[in-house]
Amino acid sequence: MILCFSILINNNGFSISPAYSSVEQNNISNPFSSTSSFQSKASILDNLPSQNITVGDINIVYKQIGKSDGKPIILITGAGATMDMWNPLLIENLISANYKVIIFENRGVGQSTVGTKEFSINQFANDTLGLLDALKISKADILGWSLGGFIAQQLALLHPEKVNSLILYATSCGGPSDRPTPPEIMQIITNSSMSPQERVQKDIPFLFPPTNWFKAHSDYLNYLPIPKETITQPILLKQLEAATTWKGTCNALSNITQPTLVIVGADDDAAPDSLTLAEKISGSWFIRIGTAGHGLMYQHPEAFNKLVLTFLENSKEP
């Protein structure tokens, strides 16, 4: 059985209503405590020192935020995203709940090196495993966004002993039946004349579809971190090739036994495929948030963060 909810956002907060019938080394306690605005929190996160560690054939650049004895949670970014694209409000909420948050750059992204191994979802999962082992983390909660959700699923299937719970945000089970990248996004990706910052701005209709939320927020850029790190066009294309050639997990999802939250914006292209994840992962939660797209964690941060923390609280090991 899965728990399915649709989240309706209004001026009074958010409410939860059934959407479908049920279907069978930085020891920093709270770096954000003295600031309130989104951009100032993003700036603090940017200014926290990065570290690097050798994992197999690459050096991975990462940041570890929170108490050293906090419960570890790993955040895995999507295609084209750098670790400074995570919403700092999410990270603040997690460390306030006594989590140790690890964010990192995937292979070839930002200051993480490219290495010699083939770009593939399996390899990205093994890179994440290697980071966990290098940091001496025996088990962690895993949050994967978009392509990061592919990596999280593969990690849970290849190394279930390392995964306490899964949060699959704006993603699918991939494979041949997966929806292709929208043509307008591919045009942006293949335009080598744009800077990474320009690409983010061009991605706005994908992150924030033209819904009532978008129309009501002419200041939408204030809801986005400004990326300082970069991803080159060749690396981005390699990420997309890894995603499109991945066989997916659709036929293996019943083997995922960890508590799982599937969360997606109703206006996201990934929304229809996300339900498949929840249907096939036993006992999973499925949350669909209205008036939200691929960037729902920016559009509705309070709802997103509360849902993530509520799920994590319910998924704690005894």
Q: Model-derived features: where do they sit?
A:
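Short glycine-enriched nucleophile-adjacent loop
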Residues: 149-160, 166
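Conserved alpha/beta-hydrolase "acid-adjacent" motif
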Residues: 269-274
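Conserved HGGG/HGGXW glycine-rich cap/lid loop of the alpha/beta-hydrolase fold
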Residues: 58-111
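Conserved alpha/beta-hydrolase catalytic His-Asp/Glu region
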Residues: 177-179, 197-247, 251-252
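Active-site loop/oxyanion-hole signature of alpha/beta-hydrolase fold enzymes
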Residues: 103, 108-143
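Catalytic active-site module of serine/aspartate enzymes centered on a nucleophile-bearing elbow/loop
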Residues: 284-318
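Flexible "cap/lid" loop of the alpha/beta hydrolase fold
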Residues: 157, 166-194
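Short beta-strand/loop motif that positions the catalytic acidic residue
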Residues: 256, 262-264
